[in-house]
Amino acid sequence: MKIYNKSYSLTQFESFLSCFIPYRTIFVDIETTGLSSKKNNIYCIGLAFFQNDQILIRQLFAQKQQEEKEILSEFLDFLSKNCNSIYTFNGKTFDLPFLEKRCALHGFSFSATDYPGKDLLQDFRPLKNLLQLPHLRQKDLEQFLGIGREDLYDGGKLISVYMKYEETQDPELEHLLRLHNHEDMLGMLRLLPIYQYNILFQGEFKIQSMHVITEKDHLGTERNSLEIHLSLSDGLPKNITGVNEQIRFLFHGKEGIVSLPVCEDTLHYYLPDYKNYYYLTEEHTIIHKSIAQFVDSQFCQKATPDNCYLPKKGMFLAGNKKSDFFRFQQDRKDKTYYMDLSDLLDVDQKILSADITPALQEELQLLIAERLKKFKPML
């Protein structure tokens, strides 16, 4: 068995990493001779951890498959002295169950549940559509951030390389094997800024200004949208942009522009206490029951849930659910609720900052966050 250590200055990584990562966190990645934890062995365990103002990458490398027990023993001893939580990439599905099984076969006790942490792959899955990535392999995410690699192999292709190394002990083959694991460890650390995109799903941004714009689509039809300028609580590692029928967005650094479709229509606000109203059949409107006694009964009938509404013509923004702002509908069974923008717009189709109340801020933050969560790029 060989043990390799390489240190990096914390300044080589994003400055927030040491604050973002819980105390005594270890990043773990394993290399194996196959996918079966019953039949195959672990030949390398990579560990990355913070030590003072440095990041240290340690590799426990088995020169022979028979040395698996040694590297597992060293791994468990290290965890017992230095670890409270474990971070991995796809570790909950592969690395950690594999380690548990191999430890058990050698008579060691190891349970991943004793080291609560994060699986970066699972955490990043909800971001796939937002980042518009076809796959979420570690190398795909690294390429998205512009992270290069010297390593050209994947774990599966290195199995035959390890078998040849085991026979020859060729140092060049060992370098290839260790390089892949080492760059996986570095890659995990460098992918941590992707967590910053979660601020978009959590609505951690502030609306700075809003105005309605009118544009022509590819068919020449005029369409209205509400353009919202945002400031983000934290900067994003890479600019992103996207468009579909529900939202258009551009985020760069600590700023963002979001456009939401707006419709011009006559919509209805349905009154819940319909029993207190009467419907005028000629005027197609409602009056309170206290006034109905003065109207000819042949032109007046008790209101129903379907016709007890106040019509409003204007510009409307579709929302996710009914609220104090989103309360208009196309009809009573319509599950989409709309907010009337007309009274908020000035002569330049802008919504003044003074009119963006804390309650409206929160409502629109939730709406934008929900649209971003559900975003799927147009094909």
Would you name each region that the model predicts?
Residues 1-28, 33-40, 50-379:
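DEDD superfamily 3′-5′ metal-dependent exonuclease/proofreading module
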Residues 45-47:
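Short beta-strand scaffold segments in enzyme catalytic cores
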